[in-house]
């Protein structure tokens, strides 16, 4: 039986539409995108990866890399909402960080419980098969609404029972890319999938303030590519003067140190300058 294949991406993979479309001939039909980590990090590629994965497959989910605590659930949910992802979206908790406690199950349930209480019921837990086998994640005591996304490489089976998604490789088609078999077709476009909200941009000249954790300056438009990034970075609360310039349908801010995003999810206009 041929199972649906989904990929999971982070800042290490491309965020272009051509990247996601290029995977379709290999049977890829969905994507899980890393959105956040801890309480300070949001993937700089998440917005584009979410939008372009949805364009390519008609469905997309997101995950949070966990370091423990329900305060991370609050942070994750805030980012989910800012991305415009509705309550049909699959949200996953990535449980693999080396700083996690030896027993994680109670904390996992609290994290998922917070999301569930806020109306997000399509939830899953990601972890290595060894964490389940060793009891670090107690499968029997996980919240009943949590689906299982299990990683096990170099084997013919996931290694535990009742798995919903099996991440079977981190080198899909020779690329540095994780891929999974979606046994239950959880990420399947059915016309009811979430539709990311189109980003809104500032179009004015003025004083701006960074509202997210970190944004990068770029040498030129469009704001893409690691080679195009400058070493200049702005952290939350930083202020700068910028002039809005348009590249296609996207506005950016031209500054003395390069080009910055004009996306309203990342910056606030403090004062318009005529």
Task: Mark where each language-model region is.
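Functionally critical loop-and-helix segments that line ligand-binding/catalytic clefts
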Residues: 1-13, 18, 25, 29, ...
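Glycine-rich, charge-decorated loop segments at or immediately adjacent to ligand/cofactor-binding or catalytic sites
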Residues: 69-71, 75, 131-142
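Beta-loop motif signature
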Residues: 196-252, 259-260, 265-274
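Short beta-strand/turn micro-motifs composed of small residues
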Residues: 64, 127, 152
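Substrate-binding cleft of extracellular glycoside hydrolase catalytic domains
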Residues: 1-121, 145
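Short Gly/Pro-enriched loop/turn and capping motifs at secondary-structure junctions
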Residues: 98-100, 130-133, 154-158, 170-173, ...
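Aromatic-lined carbohydrate-recognition surfaces of secreted/lumenal glycan-active proteins
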Residues: 120-133
């Amino acid at each position: 039986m041929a199972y649906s294949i989904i990929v999971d991406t982070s800042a290490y993979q491309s965020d272009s539409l051509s990247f996601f479309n290029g995977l379709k001939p290999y049977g890829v039909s969905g994507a899980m995108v890393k959105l956040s980590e801890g309480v300070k990090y949001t993937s700089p590629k998440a917005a584009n990866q979410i939008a372009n994965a949805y364009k390519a497959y008609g469905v997309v989910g997101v995950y949070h890399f966990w370091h423990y605590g329900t305060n991370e659930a609050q942070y994750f949910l805030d980012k989910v909402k800012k991305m415009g992802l509705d309550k049909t979206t699959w949200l996953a908790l990535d449980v693999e960080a080396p700083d996690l406690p030896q027993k994680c199950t109670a904390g996992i349930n609290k994290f998922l419980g917070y999301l569930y209480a806020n109306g997000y019921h399509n939830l899953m837990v990601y972890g290595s098969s060894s964490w389940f086998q060793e009891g670090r994640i107690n499968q029997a005591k996980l919240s009943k609404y949590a689906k299982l996304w299990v990683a096990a490489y170099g084997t013919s089976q996931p290694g535990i029972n009742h798995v919903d998604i099996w991440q079977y490789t981190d080198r899909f088609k020779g690329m540095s890319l994780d891929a999974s078999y979606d046994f239950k077709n959880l990420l399947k476009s059915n016309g009811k999938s979430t539709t990311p909200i189109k980003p809104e941009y500032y179009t004015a000249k003025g004083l701006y303030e960074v509202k997210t954790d970190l944004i990068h300056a770029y040498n030129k438009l469009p704001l893409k590519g690691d080679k195009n990034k400058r070493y200049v970075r702005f952290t939350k609360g930083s202020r700068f003067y910028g002039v809005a310039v348009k590249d296609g349908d996207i506005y950016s801010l031209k500054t003395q140190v390069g080009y910055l995003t004009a996306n309203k999810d990342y910056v606030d206009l403090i004062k318009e300058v005529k």
